[in-house]
């Protein structure tokens, strides 16, 4: 799996390499990570930013659910009794698409996240377009960040202001400290990762 993802989305592959030890990675599955629904699950922000869809099966019936609509709360999801995740559908990369992701943790490997952020976008006329941004560690479940996406959409990378991102973070998430990091740290990192993700596009724009 890492090899397939490496070619298309190197940042996602890096997140996967930092997920647990090799024995864990060789037996674990993405579907299991998703179904477990940890608020700090590492694969989900990447998959959400890439527009992943889940195929759910119960008996001979299947249905498709966007991953960013899968969770209803902490460790809660839309799976019905007897239903399981049969497949994860991921769109192929398109020309001009930018995907960035980064996990922040105390240790580089084999550690749970303070937060993990992932973003997908393209540049059209020098402005950010089709922005999808997702996090873990900021809410009861991994999630998209539509208020932050709105701040970014249609803006030139150089025009994005830290203060606007801070306001969107405050409006999107309930402040709470955790064992791995304070809210002040998480919210600062959440903002700075976005700025880092678009920084390299300023010269292009």
Residue positions per predicted region:
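C-terminal structural segment of proteins
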Residues: 1-205
């Amino acid at each position: 799996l890492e090899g397939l993802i490496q070619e298309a989305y190197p940042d996602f592959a890096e997140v996967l390499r930092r997920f647990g030890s090799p024995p864990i990675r060789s037996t674990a599955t993405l579907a299991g990570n998703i179904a477990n629904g940890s608020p700090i699950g590492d694969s989900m922000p990447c998959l959400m930013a890439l527009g992943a869809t889940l195929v759910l099966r119960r008996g001979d019936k299947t249905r498709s659910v966007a991953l960013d609509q899968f969770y209803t709360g902490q460790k809660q999801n839309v799976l019905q009794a007897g239903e399981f995740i049969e497949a994860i559908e991921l769109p192929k990369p398109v020309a001009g698409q930018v995907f960035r992701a980064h996990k922040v943790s105390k240790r580089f490997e084999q550690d749970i996240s303070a937060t993990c952020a992932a973003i997908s976008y393209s540049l059209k006329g020098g402005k950010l377009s089709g922005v999808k941004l997702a996090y873990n560690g900021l809410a009861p479940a991994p999630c998209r960040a539509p208020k932050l996406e709105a701040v970014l959409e249609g803006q030139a990378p150089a025009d994005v202001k830290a203060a606007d991102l801070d306001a969107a973070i405050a409006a999107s998430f309930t402040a709470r400290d955790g064992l791995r990091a304070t809210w002040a740290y998480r919210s600062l990192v959440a903002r700075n990762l976005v700025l880092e993700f678009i920084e390299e596009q300023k010269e292009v724009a």
